Amino acid sequence: MNIQQFWSDVLAQRADEIREYFHADAYVNWHCSNEHFTVEEFIRANCEYNGYGVSVGDWDGEVEKIVTTDDMIITATRVYPKDRSASFHVTSFIKLKDDKIVAMDEYWADDGEAPKWRQDMNIGRKIDLI
């Protein structure tokens, strides 16, 4: 499976192309919001989403890390509106069978500043992204 092309299709919200990456009975779990989706539900959630005042088709992003095993691809991907008015990271555990997705477990987070209590402790520093 071409993981870069998968993410390109997801970010461009191309429903027909996204569908081709999945087995018919595959599922997607979004653990941070406790949601379980069929493939069709995942496609609707992804392709019809226009939150943050962003129109469908105005999303972008970049895959920052890829780890592969025999039957799994793990990605860390940054997702943002094309105007960069918001930013999110998603860690995806993508289980494959016959080069198609059978299960995908995702963990989404909003990007932002450290919480005030940690800032007040004067610990840590910003990550230098190259």
Q: Language-model features: where?
A:
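Short acidic-aromatic low-complexity motifs
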Residues: M1-D25
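A beta-strand edge to alpha-helix "cap/lid" segment located at domain peripheries
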Residues: C47-I130
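Charged/polar, solvent-exposed surface patches and flexible loops
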Residues: Q5-S8, E20, R44-G51, Q119
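A solvent-exposed, acidic/Ser-Thr-rich amphipathic alpha-helical stretch
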Residues: D16, A24-T69
